[in-house]
Each structure stands twice: as C-alpha cells, then as structure tokens.
Amino acid sequence: MIRRVWPVLLAAALSAACTHVPQKSALAEWSPSRNFDDRRPRLIVLHATEMDSAEGALRVLKSANSGGRVSAHYLIAEDGRIVQLVKDSQRAWHAGGGRWGGYNDLNSVSLGIELDNDGEEAFAPAQIESLLRLLADLCQRHAIPREAVIAHGDMAPTRKRDPSARFPWQRLAEAGFGLWYGDDLPEPPAGFDAALALRAFGYDTRDLPAAVRAFTRRFRGEEREALDDTDRRILFDLLNGGARP
C-alpha cells in the first residue's frame, strides 16, 4: 500500500519540543537581513543563487532591491563559508508562491538555504560538505525530520528549477538527508496512479507536466514531462520508504 510519507514526517515535526532552541548556528557568520517575519521551521528548502558571486547574492538578500525584497536564512559560498542572514525563528522571504504536501505558505514553515551556484555548474565539494554539516545542525536543533529537505523547484515546479539538475541529491541521502531510491526497484502494482503518487509525495500536480519535470530533475538529473517505467518504479519505491542510509 502506498504510504503518504511527507504528511507523516511533517506531523512528527509539529509534535516535537522546541523550547530554548538556539536561533543562530554556531557554524555561520552572522550578517543580518531586515527582510523577515516570525515563525517556526518544519522543513528545509534548498536554493541556488543563480548569480555570479556570493557577495552579489548577499547584497540582494540583505537589501530592499527593486525586484522585490528577498532573503534566506543561510548562504553557503562555493568555498564552504556559511553566512546566516535571518534567525531560524524568523520567516525569511525565500520560497515565494508554491505548495508542498499540505503547506501553501512555505516561508512560514521552512528554513531557506541559498547555495552560491549559477544554476549550471557542478556544486563544489567544500560547499556540499558545509551544507551537510549545516543540515545536521538545523535538524538536530529544531527536530526537523532529516527527510524533510526539498528543492525550491519541488515546491514551485511551474516557475523554479533550482538548485538544478546537477545538485547531488544522492550524496545528501547517503548522509541521511532527503529521500532517495533503492538499487532494486519494485514493480508498481496494477492500477498504480503516478499523478496521485506524485501528489502523495508532496508535489502540486495541478500542472502535471511541471510536477514531472521537478521530479525527474531531482531523481533522474534531467527534465522530462512524462514518466517512463523507471521513473514510476522510483516513485513507487520512494513512497514506500526508498533507500535507507
């Protein structure tokens, strides 16, 4: 039977104790942004800056720029340096419009991490190692399920594609963050509804081709608008727990 993985994971986060939790990471420099509201984190959204430099991204994330004010809780530079801009308890303006699972306002329930990357290049090993350390810190301090790490493109599939098809999701899963599939993929049962399964996983399927693009970008490293047999097997495996680190 297909299990609704994400609602269960996020419900667990809701019930976790969160008293006297530090709202700044000891791993990061503090460089405050004024663009935030207050709220509590329950999942983590990964972004790519899609800019030429970390310094340029910092300026945008901290200023009232003409394109609309944006921010994130953390920025990780290509060399692995971590900068915190907004306290974890505060609502940074990073996600924009979108949906994931039962959530319609992702800014109110998530922490946003920007990765210094132009959206096309490979992610630097030092950057990924810093990301893994930061994820461990955030999940531990806020009792966020380690599986509750998603892409910006996952929650906004019609308008976003970051952190890109080159992001190493399997590497994260091997370290215990996010979800990945196993080596032996089971055959879905007769009548398996892939659209329903994508929605159960968390995707907004009102634009089904966009949801499929987001899924294949994350789990196959390419963008397609129709699922093939392997995609369907992967989706079925993920809904039943996927690979375990």
Q: Where are the regions that the model predicts?
A:
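Short, well-ordered secondary-structure micro-motifs within conserved domains or adaptor modules
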Residues: I44-H47, T216
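Bacterial N-terminal signal peptides that target proteins for export
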Residues: M1-P7
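Active-site-adjacent loop/helix surface patches within enzyme catalytic domains
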Residues: H20-R39, L43, E50-E147
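Bacterial N-terminal signal peptides
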Residues: P7-A16
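Basic/polar, cationic surfaces and motifs that engage anionic cell-wall
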Residues: C18-Q23, G119, F123-P245
